[in-house]
Amino acid sequence: MTALTQMKCEACQADAPKVTDAELAELIRMVPDWGVQVRDGIMQLERVYKFKNFKLAMAFTNKLADLAEEEFHHPGILTEWGKVTVTWWSHSIKGLHKNDFIMAAKTDQLLD
């Protein structure tokens, strides 16, 4: 995994800077399975995880909930039969912050 998994999220206030285009290009390479989506003008990171059944998808969702509480940074989560869609963005700045990439990397690590 990347060095992002060793980092902790920092408190993100409404005046915190969003990632720049250069930072985005660098950080997205560190979480290659994630894509950037824009919804309602807000840039977000998103990944769909596949599972063999609903129970495994739910177990992953619960591990992700624990991680989100530990870091005090919370994603959008859609749990369905055989898949979980995870979306990270920083609500306070209405866009992407380094925290979102840290959490994307840590979310990937939950599969190990």
Swiss-Prot record:
Keywords: Lyase. It holds the Pfam family Pterin_4a. InterPro entries: PCD_sf, Pterin-4-alpha-carb_dehyd, Pterin_deHydtase. It catalyses: (4aS,6R)-4a-hydroxy-L-erythro-5,6,7,8-tetrahydrobiopterin = (6R)-L-erythro-6,7-dihydrobiopterin + H2O. It comes from the Bacteria. Its EC number is 4.2.1.96. SUPFAM superfamilies: PCD-like. One of its GO terms (molecular function) is 4-alpha-hydroxytetrahydrobiopterin dehydratase activity. The keyword Lyase applies. It is an enzyme of class 4 (lyase). One of its GO terms (biological process) is tetrahydrobiopterin biosynthetic process. Belongs to the pterin-4-alpha-carbinolamine dehydratase family. This is Putative pterin-4-alpha-carbinolamine dehydratase. It comes from Shewanella sp. (strain ANA-3).
